[in-house]
Structures are given as structure tokens and as C-alpha cells.
Amino acid sequence: MHAYVYKSQRKQDTFVYLATRDDFSGLPAAVQAQLAPFTFVLDVALTPERRLAQADAATVREALGKHGFYLQLPKTIVLAGECDYD
């Protein structure tokens, strides 16, 4: 299975994987409104051996098969000074 990866121009470190190149029709309108425009960055073969930097390839394949897209959001980093330990 192939995935076509697009980077959001509005949200840093946010990517959309599509099952079909340039086919954003399955992406919910609310997601498109918040993240578009997108820039194409990568065409990747999602083989069982494939390792992705921020996502599990099997999870991405499953989402592409069910929904036609996978949304990769940035990981949140919490600094020790921002934590409430009470």
C-alpha cells in the first residue's frame, strides 16, 4: 500500500497521509478548514517492515483502508515547570 504525505501549512509538525494522491475528499471539512493548505512531501510504500518516524505503519495502513486518510499530529512536550504536582 502507498501513502501520499502532505504537510499542513498552518500547523507545524502536522501531516495528512492519503490513500490516493491529491484526494482530500475523505478528509473532514473541519480538518481541512484548520490545516489547509497542504504541501506534498512524500510518497511512501507502507510495507509491514516500514518504520515511520512518528506513527506506526500498521495503524496508518488501517486508517487509510477504513477512512482514506491518517492524521499525524505533533507530540506535546510538557516541561517540568509547567506541571502541577499537587
UniProtKB/Swiss-Prot annotation:
**SUPFAM superfamilies xref list:** YcgL-like
Domain YcgL, by residue range, is 1-83
Query: Record's Pfam families?
Result: YcgL
The name of this protein is YcgL domain-containing protein XAC4085
Species per Swiss-Prot/TrEMBL record? Xanthomonas axonopodis pv. citri (strain 306)
